[in-house]
C-alpha cells in the first residue's frame, strides 16, 4: 500500500496540493469519466473546461476562490481546437486558470508522428545518386484522412522542403511580365517536366509570394518562362505593392523553386507526394528515421478563445503551457501573395486614376485576410498568458485578434515560428479596404490596454519571411516592454497600420526597453522597430537595436534600426541605443519628437 501511495505522489508531481476549486488533468493516468480530483484526474483539458463550466452555471461554492485546472506533464493532442467560451469566464475574485503543475512539461500539440520508414526508393523522379539513401513512409492518417503537410520536424528541427538551391539560397529572376503573367528565370539544371506540385517562392521587397507552378516553357537561350496557377497568378501580377524588382540598385528580385521529388538531393530535405501522401526524407549520414522523432502537424489551430461583442470572455489565465506543432497549409491550396506582415491579398490592383476620399494620392486598393494562428483570442478582456512556450508553429503563434483589452503576455518564449510570433489588433482585413483609417463605432472593438513584456522571440518568420516578431495593428494604450527579439527575416517590433495621417483608434502606445537584433535577415524596407500612421501620445524609448542584417537578396538598402514608415506621427523617440543615423523616414507627420 505504501509503495502505491508513493508511486501516485511521484506521478502527480507538482500537483499534490489541492483546493476546493481545483480540477486535475493527466494525459497518462486520467479518465474523462473521473471526478477530476488529484487521485482521479480527467484526461483532457476540454473535459476540465466543461466541468468548470458546469460549476459556474450551477453557482457551485467551489468556484468562490477561482477555478484552477491543474495539468500534469504529458502531451495533449486535441482532435479539434480547444474552445474557450464566454461560459468559461471567471471574475476578478474567481478567475479561471489553466496551468501546468509546478515543474511540469505540458504540451498541447497538433503534431502526428510519421512512422514505418523504409529505406531506398526506385522512383525515377529522384536523382539517381540518392535513391538508395532516401527513406519513404506513408503519411499518417487523422480520423481516416491522409495528413497533408508543408512542415516536417525531425528531432525537433524543421526540415527543409526539397529545393533547387538549398536552405535560404535563391537565384535572380530575369523578367517579370504583367502582360502574360510570367516570370523568366535561368533554365533550371534539373528536368522538372513531371513536377506537378512545384512552387516558386518570390522575394519581393518587404514580402514574399508563394506561387504554384502551372507550366514552364524553355525559351532555348538558357532562359525559361514560368506560368502559375490561379488565383495567385492574377493577384501577383495585378497588385502594384510589393512587386518584384528588375535591375534594382542591388540587382533583380530573387526566387527559389521548391516541392518536387526531383529536387530532393541534400541531407535534411523532404518531400510529400500527392495524391498518395507518401513522405520522402533524406536523413543526414548515419541517421535512421525509425529511430528519430519525426512529426508533421495535422491542424492549424490549437486553441480559440472565442467571445462575442455581446458576451466577451473575461478573467482567464494560461500558465506554464507549451503549444507546438501547428500547421500552415493554405499556400498548397491557393498560393500565397501578401501585402505586408503576412497578410495575404484577397484582391488588390492599381487604380487607373489615383485617389480615394481620404487620400487623394492613393494609387492602389487592397483587401486582405489575416494569417492563420495556433492560438487566438477575440472579444476578451483580462486575459493573461504567462510562462508559456510556443514552438514549431506553422503560421502565427499567438493572435489577439479583435476587441481584446486589459490583457497581458508575460515571460513567454517563442521559438521556430513560421509566421508572426505575437500579433495584436485589427489590420483592416475581412472586407475593409486596408488603406482606410479604422475607427470603430464601438470603442470596445479596438484592442487596447495590452502589455507584451519579458518575452523572448527567436527564429520567427522562418516560413513566411514577410512576417514579424511582434505585430500590432490598430491598438491603443499598448505597452511592448522588456522583450528580446532575434533572428527574424523582416522587421522586429511593428506597431501601426493603414498608411494614413488621419486620426484613427491608434494612440498612447509604448515601445520601451526592448532588445532587437539579427532582424531583416532576408527582406528589406524593414526596421528593428517599425511604425505606420498617426499614433498620438506614443513613445519609443530606451530600446537597444543592432544594425540590420545584410540581407543577401535585398534589392535596395532600405533597412533601419527604427523605421518611421508612411505617415508615422505622434511619437516621442528618445534614448535608444543604436548606430547613429539609423532612422528611416517615409513621409513622417509634423508631431514627431525625435532625439538621437
Please annotate each region the language model reported.
Residues 63-69, 94-96, 450, 467-468, ...:
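Residue-level recognition of the N-termini of beta-strands and the immediately preceding loop/turn
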Residues 79-86, 93, 97, 558, ...:
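Predominantly extracellular beta-rich ligand-binding scaffolds that present long acidic/polar faces
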Residues 314-325, 361, 381-395, 404-419, ...:
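Right-handed parallel beta-helix
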Residues 4-14:
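Sec-dependent N-terminal signal peptides
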Residues 70, 77, 83, 97-99, ...:
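Extracellular beta-strand solenoid repeats
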Residues 58, 80-81, 300, 327-333, ...:
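Short glycine/acidic-rich loop motifs that flank beta-strands on beta-rich extracellular proteins
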Residues 24-379, 384, 430-441:
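Extracellular polysaccharide-degrading/modifying enzymes targeting complex plant/algal/animal polysaccharides
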Amino acid at each position: 500500500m505504501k509503495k502505491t501511495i508513493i508511486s501516485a505522489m511521484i506521478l502527480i508531481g507538482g500537483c499534490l496540493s489541492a483546493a476546493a476549486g481545483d480540477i486535475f488533468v493527466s494525459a497518462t493516468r486520467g479518465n474523462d469519466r473521473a471526478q477530476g480530483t488529484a487521485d482521479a484526474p480527467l484526461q483532457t483539458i476540454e473535459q476540465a473546461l466543461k466541468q468548470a463550466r458546469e460549476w459556474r452555471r450551477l453557482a457551485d461554492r467551489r468556484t468562490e476562490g477561482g477555478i484552477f485546472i491543474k495539468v500534469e506533464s504529458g502531451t495533449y493532442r486535441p482532435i479539434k481546437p480547444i474552445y474557450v467560451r464566454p461560459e468559461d469566464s471567471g471574475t476578478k475574485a474567481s478567475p479561471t486558470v489553466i496551468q501546468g503543475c509546478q515543474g511540469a512539461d505540458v504540451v498541447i500539440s497538433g503534431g502526428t508522428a510519421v512512422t514505418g520508414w523504409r529505406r531506398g526508393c526506385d522512383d525515377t523522379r529522384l536523382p539517381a545518386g540518392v535513391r538508395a539513401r532516401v527513406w519513404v513512409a506513408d503519411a499518417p492518417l487523422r480520423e481516416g484522412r491522409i495528413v497533408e503537410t508543408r512542415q516536417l520536424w525531425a528531432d525537433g528541427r524543421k526540415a527543409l522542403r526539397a529545393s533547387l538551391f538549398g536552405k535560404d539560397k535563391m537565384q535572380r529572376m530575369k523578367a517579370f511580365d504583367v502582360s502574360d503573367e510570367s516570370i523568366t528565370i535561368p533554365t533550371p539544371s534539373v528536368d522538372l517536366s513531371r513536377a506537378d506540385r512545384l512552387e516558386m517562392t518570390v522575394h519581393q521587397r518587404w514580402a514574399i509570394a508563394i506561387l504554384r507552378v502551372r507550366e514552364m516553357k524553355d525559351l532555348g537561350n538558357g532562359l525559361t518562362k514560368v506560368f502559375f496557377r490561379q488565383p495567385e497568378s492574377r493577384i501577383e501580377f495585378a497588385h502594384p505593392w510589393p512587386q518584384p524588382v528588375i535591375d534594382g540598385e542591388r540587382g533583380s528580385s530573387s526566387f527559389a523553386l521548391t516541392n518536387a521529388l526531383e529536387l530532393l538531393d541534400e541531407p535534411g530535405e523532404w518531400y510529400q507526394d500527392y495524391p498518395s501522401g507518401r513522405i520522402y526524407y533524406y536523413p543526414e549520414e548515419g541517421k535512421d528515421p525509425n529511430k528519430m522523432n519525426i512529426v508533421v502537424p495535422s491542424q492549424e489551430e490549437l486553441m480559440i478563445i472565442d467571445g462575442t461583442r455581446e458576451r466577451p470572455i473575461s478573467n482567464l489565465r494560461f500558465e506554464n503551457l507549451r503549444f507546438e506543432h501547428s500547421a500552415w497549409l493554405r499556400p498548397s491550396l491557393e498560393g500565397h501573395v501578401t501585402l505586408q506582415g503576412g497578410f495575404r491579398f484577397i484582391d488588390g490592383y492599381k487604380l487607373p486614376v489615383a485617389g480615394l476620399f481620404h487620400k487623394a494620392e492613393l494609387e492602389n486598393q487592397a483587401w486582405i485576410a489575416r494569417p492563420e494562428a495556433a492560438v487566438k483570442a477575440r472579444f476578451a478582456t483580462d486575459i493573461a498568458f504567462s510562462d508559456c512556450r510556443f514552438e514549431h508553429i506553422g503560421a502565427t503563434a499567438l493572435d489577439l485578434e479583435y476587441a481584446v483589452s486589459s490583457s497581458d503576455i508575460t515571460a513567454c518564449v517563442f521559438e521556430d515560428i513560421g509566421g508572426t510570433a505575437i500579433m495584436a489588433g485589427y489590420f483592416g482585413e475581412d472586407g475593409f479596404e486596408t488603406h482606410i483609417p479604422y475607427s470603430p463605432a464601438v470603442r470596445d472593438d479596438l484592442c487596447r490596454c495590452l502589455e507584451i513584456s519579458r518575452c523572448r522571440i527567436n527564429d520567427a518568420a522562418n516560413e513566411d519571411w514577410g512576417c514579424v516578431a511582434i505585430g500590432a495593428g490598430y491598438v491603443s494604450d499598448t505597452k511592448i516592454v522588456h522583450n528580446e527579439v532575434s533572428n527574424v527575416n523582416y522587421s522586429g517590433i511593428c506597431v501601426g497600420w493603414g498608411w494614413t495621417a488621419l486620426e484613427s483608434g491608434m494612440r498612447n502606445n509604448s515601445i520601451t526597453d526592448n532588445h532587437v537584433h539579427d532582424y531583416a535577415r532576408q527582406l528589406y524596407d524593414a526596421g528593428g522597430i517599425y511604425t505606420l500612421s498617426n499614433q498620438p501620445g506614443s513613445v519609443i524609448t530606451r530600446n537597444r537595436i543592432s544594425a540590420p542584417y545584410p540581407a543577401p537578396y535585398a534589392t535596395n538598402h532600405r533597412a533601419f534600426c527604427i523605421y518611421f514608415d508612411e505617415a508615422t506621427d505622434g511619437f516621442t523617440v528618445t534614448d535608444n541605443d543604436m548606430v547613429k543615423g539609423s532612422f528611416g523616414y517615409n513621409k513622417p507627420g509634423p508631431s514627431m519628437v525625435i532625439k538621437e
